[in-house]
Amino acid sequence: MVKAVAVLRGDSKITGTVTFEQADENSPTTVSWNIKGNDPNAKRGFHVHQFGDNTNGCTSAGPHFNPYGKTHGAPEDSERHVGDLGNFETDAEGNAVGSKQDKLIKLIGAESVLGRTLVVHAGTDDLGRGGNEESKKTGNAGARPACGVIGIAA
């Protein structure tokens, strides 16, 4: 079992953790989140981005992690970036707690997300269905108020 965590910080009140667990290279990865400080009753996009570089804030993380050259999509789509995690939903206080399994997110192997950045976006991810070029790249999910580098966890 490999475990990893991203501790979220940024230029906003959004904080939290996103954890990853994978039993072996052929198993799906469980992604769990506990994120506070978002807008209440909202859907917010979150993605794994290419770089683990946050020297200039979350913008240094680069584009979505996309080793196969696909267009942006929903986590359940066959045509999607590896880093496309979709949206999480917040409660009336702006907090989000949840988990999902993902078949493309890997902690083991050549396409591992270790050392890359998990970014929480300011808007809702349209899952590549927005009808414009930006939708096929970013899901029109907006600014990057919080992020954290994905590191090996104890």
UniProtKB/Swiss-Prot annotation:
Is this entry keyworded Cytoplasm? yes
In Gene Ontology terms, what is a biological process of this protein?
A: removal of superoxide radicals
Per its record, the protein catalyses: 2 superoxide + 2 H(+) = H2O2 + O2
Question: How is its cofactor bound, per UniProt?
Answer: Binds 1 copper ion per subunit. Binds 1 zinc ion per subunit.
**Keywords, alphabetical:** Antioxidant, Copper, Cytoplasm, Disulfide bond, Metal-binding, Oxidoreductase, Zinc
Residues the entry annotates as binding substrate:
144
Q: What is its EC number?
A: 1.15.1.1
Which CDD domains does this entry report, sorted A to Z? Cu-Zn_Superoxide_Dismutase
Where does this protein reside within or beyond the cell?
Cytoplasm
Q: Which domain of life is it from?
A: Eukaryota
Q: Which residues bind Zn(2+)?
A: 64, 72, 81, 84
Which annotated residues bind Cu cation? 47, 49, 64, 121
What does the UniProt function comment say about this protein? Destroys radicals which are normally produced within the cells and which are toxic to biological systems.
This chain belongs to the protein called: Superoxide dismutase [Cu-Zn]
Q: Which organism is it from?
A: Aspergillus fumigatus (strain ATCC MYA-4609 / CBS 101355 / FGSC A1100 / Af293)
